[in-house]
Amino acid sequence: MALKIRLSRGGSKKRPYYHIVVADARSPRDGRFLERVGAWDPMLPKDKPRVKLNEDRIQHWLNQGAQPTDRVLRFLDAAGLKKRPARNNPHKGEPGKKAQERIAAAKQAAEDAKAAEASA
């Protein structure tokens, strides 16, 4: 049984509240879970504690092999329970292949025009 530590949505419409739960990976988002190990209230102001974690139970489930989702891993990293690897994408923000070809073609056309102007 693959275990996940993930968010389960509660609250009402436009007022989300999430429980941090340990659940089987196959169960639905708000469905059956094994244990509730924390809560996250994104509606609280930033200066108030939004995340509440039961750290010893989370550590127990991590030792049992439960995998946290990306959002929960951010919370665990902030609490110092599990390290979140830094993401590295050196190509982010670079133009795509076709855009690079267009830029190269425009640069070549500008150089050709400059060379033609110099020889004339």
Swiss-Prot record:
InterPro entries named among the record's database cross-references: Ribosomal_bS16, Ribosomal_bS16_dom_sf
UniProt cross-references to Pfam families, sorted A to Z: Ribosomal_S16 (PF00886)
Protein's UniProt name: Small ribosomal subunit protein bS16
Region ranges (Disordered): 80-120
NCBIfam families in the cross-refs: S16 (TIGR00002)
Gene: rpsP
Family label: Belongs to the bacterial ribosomal protein bS16 family.
Keyword Transmembrane tagged: no
UniProt keyword annotations, A-Z: Ribonucleoprotein, Ribosomal protein
GO BP, sorted A to Z: translation
UniProt cross-references to PANTHER family, sorted A to Z: 30S RIBOSOMAL PROTEIN S16, SMALL RIBOSOMAL SUBUNIT PROTEIN BS16M
Keyword DNA-binding annotated: no
Biased composition (Basic residues): 81-90
The organism's place on the tree of life at top rank: Bacteria
Any one GO MF annotation of this record: structural constituent of ribosome
